[in-house]
């Protein structure tokens, strides 16, 4: 699993993440602050909220790779802290320690694009590990397929949804605080 936190706009890694997700069956979760759009981006907060403890244990990754800075989602923080990971690698050009999920095992000193390019160039394995990756990604996709968008009129959530759906392509929108970011996810 790759979790993408806060990044500047024009960070040039969206296409790499899409390719890695497809080629290696990697689940990519990107925060709105990441300025990343991945085709199969999952609504992970909703998946986490709607999952039982047993399901959350199954959804927890063995390997977590994090790039970027902060994530707004308290749900992803809770999920990864509570259900843990075997390995957590944070990619940092400066080597700074960011242990948001309190599971950090390694810091890889590299810029995001170089690291992701290296991963993308690896040949997908045709063994048990690849089958396991496919099954893991399929778990997330099945949970996503079960989600339906509620239409709760006269609520903050509904108002933000209507606003976002009416915005033109390639518009920049500034959110003033984490609650508005949360509602937009």
Q: Where on the chain are the PLM-derived regions?
A:
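Glycine-rich, anion-gripping cofactor-binding loops and their flanking helix/strand elements
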Residues: 4-89
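Phosphate- and divalent-cation-binding pockets in alpha/beta enzyme and binding domains
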Residues: 11-12, 74-75, 118, 162, ...
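Short loop/helix-cap segments at secondary-structure boundaries that form the rim of catalytic
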Residues: 32-42, 95-103, 184-185
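Phosphate/pyrophosphate-binding active-site segments
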Residues: 80-181
């Amino acid at each position: 699993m790759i979790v993408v936190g806060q990044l500047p706009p024009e960070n040039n890694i969206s296409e790499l993440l899409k390719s890695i997700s497809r080629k290696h069956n990697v689940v990519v979760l990107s925060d709105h602050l990441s300025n990343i759009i991945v085709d199969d981006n999952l609504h992970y907060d909703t998946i986490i909220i709607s999952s039982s403890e047993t399901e959350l244990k199954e959804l927890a990754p063995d390997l977590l790779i994090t790039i970027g800075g902060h994530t707004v989602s308290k749900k992803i923080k809770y999920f990864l802290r509570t259900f843990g990971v075997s390995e957590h690698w944070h990619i940092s050009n400066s080597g700074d320690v960011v242990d948001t999920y309190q599971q950090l095992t390694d810091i890889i000193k590299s810029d995001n694009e170089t690291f992701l390019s290296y991963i993308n160039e690896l040949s997908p394995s045709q063994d048990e590990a690849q089958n396991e990756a496919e099954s893991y990604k399929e778990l997330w996709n099945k949970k996503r397929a079960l989600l339906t968008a509620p239409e709760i009129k006269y609520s903050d959530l509904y108002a933000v949804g209507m606003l976002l759906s009416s915005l033109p392509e390639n518009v920049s929108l500034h959110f003033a605080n984490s609650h508005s970011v949360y509602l937009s996810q």
